[in-house]
Amino acid sequence: MKQFKLVNAVSASFVLIGLVLANSDSVFDKWTQEDLADYLRDNKKSLEKYATDSIEDLKTEASQVWDKHAQPKPWWQVWSSDSSSVSNSNPGWFGYTGSSDHPVSDWLFDTWSTDSLRNFLKKNGVDVDDAKASKDSLVKTAKENFNKISKSLKSSGYYPSSSYFDSWSTKDLQNWLNDNGIDYDKAVQSKDELVQKVKENIYRTSEKAEQQRLGLLESLDLAHQQILDTSGQIKDTVFDKWSSDQLTNWLESHKVNIDKNMAKKHDYLVRMAKENSANLKDDIYWYLDYMKRESSPFLTKTPEYVGSVWDSSKNFLTNLYSKFRGKTDNVINDTFLVGLDSWPKDKLKMFLDARGIKYSMLSTEHQLRELVKKSRNEKLKILPKDYQKYFDNSNWSLDDIKGWFADKKDDFQDSQTYSTIMQDFDKVSKNTNDAKDQIAKTWSNTFQSWSQEDLLQYLKSFGVPVKQTSTKDDLINLAKQNTQWLFGTVKEPAYKRYLHNVKNWSKSILGFN
């Protein structure tokens, strides 16, 4: 019987690999043999439940699973919000397909400790000259050398290979799990099992860390402070104006040890902050990079992004208003809970405030999160100012949306500090405020250089049906037509507007930012 199970488990693996290789549009195309082997090891337990099935049953089951997960999120992005800690749920035997456009280095190193980063670089032959290099500096170095390191490890860089954790000790793995509130069997001493637990949770934890860092920096109101002197260094007086709570939160976010006996003394906290002021400079650059990514122009985005941004923005804003007016279904599906664990405290409060839900000012983040879950189907009672005028007419143009977002800019973007620091970024995007005609023209010219496959994917993102007999010129013309109405230079055909309105008004809102 054991031999039979083994044979069928191996057969399940081959069926899986066959399906992977047959799917030419998937991220698996870029995976190396080592990545595939690692994937199968990661999903070993899930595969075992199919070991008693016949080969034909396995093929049937594998086909059904493939159809079900034709476009799933990567398995590391499956986030259950059943508790305040990160989920430990098993992603399923075929729960992973990822994006071939984004290497895991985008998020992999964000929650690593300084020592782990330094050891990783050293083990993989990357010299770090500065013994006092900050964590952000080490993360940057790791990302810059990621392709070279991945190649040496026989990994593609598009799967969180276990080999990236070779430099971690058992203690390192346990510390990471403990520091990030991940439940695991403390009796487990197997490094392989601990690596597996870290891999299951590291993407979700990285997303949460990003949101928490963003929330903290926004709460510090950096935009209205003169932080840098004329030489570009942190001013000596910056921390004097921070409250004790702000200082404590900032120091703890950078893993600075605080003497518990001195934790309430403002002078002590200021002194500790000044000793670690280099971290604030890292925060500023991180924040500006984040803002740049969030507000970057259409021209720096992928074709898929451009094709979806208008629909997604319109869907989101329309559904927000329609939910307030009681026009949509009162049930928010479980997708709402995806990412809830990464919400900062302010966002949780905003969600509750907009629905008139009362909560104690002393509520912990966990208590607020639980209240949000219970209140997820409550209708909005407080409609943010100036929303209505943009929703009474369901045919608003891109200019309307641009105007709305311009009205809602964060104070940070209007500040002199932002203008000063962003001047380098402005050089990159100096033409982004040109007339919409110029944007559309630029895209039209760009289409000429795209491959036929690029054009097909771009049109697919708009939901445009394409005949199999279409030539490249046909695809270019279709791309131009759909891009022109996206940017407002040509009005979308009436039948398209009708279909989009039906689609937009029928979707349920998942939450709001």
Curated annotation (Swiss-Prot):
Name of the protein in its database record: Meiotic sister chromatid recombination protein 1
Coiled coil: none
Keyword annotations of the record: Phosphoprotein
A Gene Ontology term for the protein's cellular component: plasma membrane
Top-level taxon: Eukaryota
Modified residues (Phosphoserine): S243
Pfam families noted in UniProt: Ish1 (PF10281)
Organism from which the protein derives: Saccharomyces cerevisiae (strain ATCC 204508 / S288c)
BP GO terms, sorted: protein localization to site of double-strand break; reciprocal meiotic recombination
Keyword Phosphoprotein: yes
Modified residues (Phosphothreonine): T237
Miscellaneous field: Originally MSC1 was identified in a screen for mutants that show an increase in meiotic unequal sister-chromatid recombination (SCR). Present with 1070 molecules/cell in log phase SD medium.
Name of the coding gene: MSC1
